[in-house]
From Swiss-Prot:
Binds 2 magnesium ions per subunit. NAD(+) binds at Y24, G25, S26, Q27, S50, D82, E83, K84, Q85, G133. The active site is at H107. Pathway: Amino-acid biosynthesis; L-isoleucine biosynthesis; L-isoleucine from 2-oxobutanoate: step 2/4; Amino-acid biosynthesis; L-valine biosynthesis; L-valine from pyruvate: step 2/4. Mg(2+) 2 binds at D190, E226, E230. The keyword Amino-acid biosynthesis applies. Gene3D superfamilies: 6.10.240.10, NAD(P)-binding Rossmann-like Domain. Its cofactor is Mg(2+). SUPFAM superfamilies: 6-phosphogluconate dehydrogenase C-terminal domain-like (SSF48179), NAD(P)-binding Rossmann-fold domains (SSF51735). This is Ketol-acid reductoisomerase (NAD(+)). The lineage of its organism: Bacteria, Bacillati, Bacillota, Clostridia, Thermoanaerobacterales.
Length: 332
């Protein structure tokens, strides 16, 4: 594994170049401000009069349309949602590419699954922070950084890796360390983690536990505390020191239950299903399914989302969180 740090990156590779950050959302606001504070010339783009456009103005940027930003920039970072990138590229970016420009991504979906196929005379690389935008910004302001991934898909200039590392340094990532990967590896592992563990896996586990207790006659409020609320306490321990630290920190009773019962939940059948999910990602089955779902107006996505929002755990959770003044209400 190759890891790059500050001493491996040189901001001079960005001298005389303009970086366009298209999409002033979570990552966009952080990366653009960090680059600017590192002395890089930055322009930002979003939808005129949108909330993001106004936020960019509040941050002392003069936002442009995507077409204008792509025309002006030498390095173009695309930070709009995956499902919108291909159309944005076709309509606003591709017409403004010229030999020697560079395209940057923070997720490899559209390049890996060939929804975006750049011409051969541009550089294509990835800088992917492993943390949300607000953390990328806060760590930079505190003189630290968020670990990130770097990958080069196309090296027309012969300097794509140096450009990528300079970009990573500009957002503060090389302070923490930047791990070299590929678009394929980043895309497939990211999707698998979301589907099998971080989002799909954990939500189904939480809800299955909640339903089991409620169906057995226990109060929904107690089930919520035991299966969802306390999840943060455990995840924080794992996040800070790994599984071993979590096990060291919990009671012996809890650890014994973990060691003897956990494998009855995640069985060999579960592991086989995980392999199937990974294969669907590797073969492009999931990507085609998701792209088609967007093309026809997201009927399955919207129906499933409505159904999930009406689950008992949501209404119980909303009521209980109202008892917790330390929780800030998030606007979704």
């Amino acid at each position: 594994m190759k890891i790059y740090y500050d001493q491996d990156a040189d901001l001079q590779y960005l001298d005389g170049k303009t970086v366009a950050v298209i999409g002033y959302g979570s990552q966009g606001h952080a990366q653009s401000q960090n680059l600017r504070d590192s002395g890089v010339k930055v322009v930002v783009a979003d939808i005129p009069s949108s909330e993001n456009w106004k936020k960019a103005e509040e941050a002392q940027f003069q936002p442009l349309t995507a077409d204008e930003a792509a025309r002006e920039a030498d390095i173009i970072q695309i930070l709009v949602p995956d499902e919108k990138q291909a159309a944005l590229y076709r309509e606003s970016i591709a017409p403004n590419l010229r030999p020697g420009k560079a395209l940057v991504f923070s997720h490899g979906f559209n390049i890996h699954f060939k929804q975006i196929v750049p011409p051969p005379d541009v550089d294509v690389f990835m800088v992917a922070p492993k943390g949300p935008g607000h953390l990328v910004r806060r760590m930079y302001e505190e003189g630290a950084g968020v670990p990130s991934l770097v990958a080069v898909e196309q090296d027309y200039s012969g300097q794509a890796l140096n450009l990528a590392l300079a970009y990573a340094k500009g957002i503060g990532a090389t302070r923490a360390g930047v791990i070299q990967t590929t678009f394929k590896e980043e895309t497939e592992t990211d999707l698998f983690g979301e589907q099998a563990v971080l989002c799909g896996g954990i939500t189904e586990l939480i809800r299955a536990g909640f339903d089991t207790l409620v169906d057995a006659g226990y109060q929904p409020e107690i089930a919520y505390f035991e299966c969802l609320h306390e999840m943060k306490l455990i995840v924080d321990l794992i996040y800070e020191g790994g599984i071993s630290t979590m096990r060291y920190s919990i009671s012996d009773t809890a650890e014994y239950g973990d060691l003897t019962r956990g494998k009855r939940i995640i069985t060999e059948a579960t592991r086989e299903e995980m392999k199937k999910i990974l294969k669907e990602i590797q073969d492009g089955v999931f990507a085609r399914e998701w792209l088609l779902e967007n093309q026809v107006g997201r009927p399955v996505y919207n129906a499933l989302r409505r159904k999930e929002q009406n689950h008992l755990i949501e209404t119980v959770g909303a009521r209980l969180r109202g008892m917790m003044p330390w929780l800030k209400k998030k606007v979704i």
